[in-house]
């Protein structure tokens, strides 16, 4: 669930994808090669259509630096994912077995340590000052390139108003490390 919108009027990496009938906005994390991408369907009820084409949503987009009027909701996502069964299905079984586990490289002898569980906790908080991810990295949204026009001249901005459900994902270089959706907005 999300609440209050906050507004930006500045330069962003932006893309309009007619095949997906959606707009894409890139919010770079300061000082890192990581960014959050927001995929906003052009239609207010277009989230299901985007989800049905998720591979295309996650594919690289043809971003250009555009002057935008952006309105984003504040939202917070917290999740805990149990990985033990997934890891076992992938063949990582011995580390969970008391008689076969060999974690002697960490401490003690073979059999002294065993993995009892594996969890992944994720925390994303989008607020007016920026994005906090995994409760460890604080970022501020800012333009990534200098404006191609003199500072006194501002072209008419394009609109990116996230007032309906959308998909977001965080990528490091070309790898998606987290994805989610905002499906309910309160105004």
Predicted regions and their residues:
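Secretory/exported precursors with cleavable N-terminal leaders
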Residues: 1-187
């Amino acid at each position: 669930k999300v609440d209050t919108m906050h507004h930006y009027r500045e330069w962003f990496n932006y893309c309009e994808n007619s095949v997906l009938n959606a707009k894409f906005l890139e919010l770079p994390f300061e000082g890192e090669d990581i960014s959050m991408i927001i995929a906003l369907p052009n239609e207010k009820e277009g989230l299901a259509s985007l989800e049905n084409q998720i591979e295309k949503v996650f594919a690289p987009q043809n971003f250009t630096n555009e002057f935008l009027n952006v309105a984003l909701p504040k939202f917070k996502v917290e999740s805990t994912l149990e990985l033990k069964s997934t890891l076992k299905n992938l063949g990582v079984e011995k580390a969970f077995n008391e008689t076969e586990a060999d974690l002697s490289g960490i401490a003690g002898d073979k059999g002294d340590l065993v993995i009892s569980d594996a969890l992944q906790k994720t925390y994303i908080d989008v607020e007016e000052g920026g994005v906090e991810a995994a409760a460890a990295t604080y970022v501020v949204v800012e333009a990534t390139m200098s404006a191609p026009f003199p500072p006194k001249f501002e072209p008419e901005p394009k609109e990116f108003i996230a007032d309906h459900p959308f998909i977001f994902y965080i990528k490091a270089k070309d790898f998606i490390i987290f994805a989610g959706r905002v499906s309910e907005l309160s105004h």
